[in-house]
Amino acid sequence: MLLPRIATLITGLSLGALAQAAPTVYPLTVENCGSTLNFQHAPTRTVTIGQAGTEMLYAMGLGDKVVGTSLWFNNVLDKYKAQNDKIERLADNEPSFESVIGKRPELVAVELEWMVGPQGAVGTREQFHELKIPTYLLPSDCEAKDNLVGADGTRLAPFRIETIYKSVSQLAQIFDVQERGQRLNDELKASLAKSIATAQGKQLKDASALVWFSSAQMDIEPFVAGHKGIPDFMLSTLGVRNVVASDEEWPTVGWETIAKANPTFLVIARMDRRRFPADDYEKKLAFLRSDPVTRNMDAVKHNRIIILDAMAMQASLRMFDGIEQLATAINGYDLSQ
């Protein structure tokens, strides 16, 4: 039943709305993903490595505190475009360590630990901390997750949406904009409750799905969503089962295995990034409809293919829009076929 879940969300929203956010007292200490961060004042120069953190800061009216961005999957939301156009993009993907520190940041906000972490493509947290530059890693990518196992890490427990609310609250505290953070979290919780209600009346007892992010080459095993990750949370919240059983965040699974599972829906990522051929969702669609293995899947034959922005599959503000889009799409399908 989804109704208890809705009640819990509404209760959390009401309690949050009643609480009065207190201003930040500096010096501030924040415990973050195994590191202790210290702030003498609200950061005035921030570099973001990851679109999720960038758009969180924009949503709280902190765009003027951002001096450099990087790691983009989709174009920035239209409502943030004017602000984003004023800020240097250090890289579409991972920036160099030198380009980040060259912006003289007082904070580096990081979406993914494989960017800044023990084996970080940009550097380690210690490298930044030795220069007195704190690094804030979004909790969704470190809590109950081992990023040293599997290409994109392995979930030790199912993703918890509370980690997104925690990111918003902690960033709001760091920048002393707690009321903005509280308001944003209340909006996110209300959006989630609405999406769950949309799917409530649909008979989805045996419905299943596969989420295809990308592929290094079109003719090899695709990167798909594991069963404890963020897309799995999105599906299960709406009463849909993920056909992938791996604990890895984005494991590769063969199309023969996927076809045998024959998911009710296929969810594919749309992105503006062009690192891999399958980053282009139109190439994904063409492959699904032409490959002799995939074209006979029920989801392909009955056109039950849902297209979501890649960032809607990440622990980001866009995930809530993604859940709403999923709920609306699923609600519109005739599952009697």
Model-assigned labels for residue ranges:
Residues 7-17:
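Bacterial N-terminal signal peptides
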Residues 19-55, 157, 173-212, 330-337:
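Bacterial Sec-exported substrate-binding components of ABC uptake systems
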Residues 32-34, 88-98, 141, 247-255:
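Short helix-initiation/N-cap motifs at beta->coil->alpha
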Residues 45-118:
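A short, structured surface patch at a secondary-structure boundary
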Residues 52-55, 72-75, 107-108, 113-118, ...:
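Solvent-exposed loop/turn segments at secondary-structure junctions
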Residues 74-75, 221-250:
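Alpha-helical, coiled-coil/dimerization segments enriched in small aliphatic residues
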Residues 115-123, 133-170, 202-230:
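Extracytoplasmic ligand-binding site segments that recognize negatively charged/polar headgroups
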Residues 158-167, 268-337:
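Structured C-terminal subdomain patch of bacterial secreted/periplasmic proteins
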